[in-house]
Amino acid sequence: MSSNKTKVISIFNNKGGVAKTIITWNLGDALARRGKKVLLIDFDPQSNLSIAMLGDRFPDILPTVENPYGTTIRAFLQRFLQNQGPLQFYKHQGYRTNNKVDLIASDPWLNVYSESLSVGSDLLTGNGLEKYSIINRLIQQANGNEEDKYDYVLIDLPPSFNNLVRTALYSSNYFIVPCTSDIFCSYCVGLIGETLPRFIKEWEIGCQLHDTNNPHNEKYINLGKPVFAGWIFNGYDTRKPKDKASKKIIAADYVMGSKIAEGVKKLVETLEKRIKEHPSVLQNHPSESFFLGGIEDMNILVQNSMWLNCPIARLDQIEPVKNFEDRGQWSPNQLDQIKKLKTNFLSIADRVIKHCI
């Protein structure tokens, strides 16, 4: 993969509540602060990323009588699905997100697109590969001129193994798994190892049939090969021991993080064993446990970030929300936490830049 090629990364865990949206948004913002041009794709019908970034503007981009497709991802996908003229691509920018970050906003209509996808008639026959690789086509249109390509595309996904997740993974170069400090995360990491090889095998079956019928068409040759790039530990707590100068992760979260690391090790072994046709895990991985970085529990900072449509790193530049009618001031501890989280996201961005090449 050439260094100037757009890197497409899905942020995925089939478990909910692991901060996929927050990580997608803030990692994209951190990559932009490193000078990278970033496209975020909200591919979750719940539209949390779009609402977080756009705030009060989000309802205005949804379909209306006058504009039946709106200016969300629906404008592209529905025209494609119904073969209705040229596909239209719209991008948006958040109120306070770095201006090198663009967003393709979500729409609840994504549920309709998901229902239109059939593994049997579209994928396994090879007749509907375009439907399952539509994200790749969307990115190609978003990139436009060769000189103006995105460095990174981050895709926010729903917490399931549904067809939307398949579609995103088939067009992704890498995927990153956010995890939280609970026993279910370790279990769900294992499920990825059981499910992803089947997804890849079914894509390969469809491609083989497509290539048999279209021997000179290599359109899909580089798709369907997502590589596990690592995991992010999110939401743990720290304490400062009396005899120590710095905070340490609390024992319970440390133990849980270790269990997740064990689950990730098994995931890597499973992927390498069951996917032989291409590399399935990062060869130039950041650590033995594929650990990309940690994000301490953000507590009320997350609520303020969502209410103010502001990435964590910029919260110290605006007043916090005490309630919907009153503004307060950040406490010294909160300002320290914002600074630390900013550093954490930049560190993860640096590892992504170094290893996802």
Q: How would you describe each model-predicted region?
A:
Residues 1-357:
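P-loop NTP-binding core
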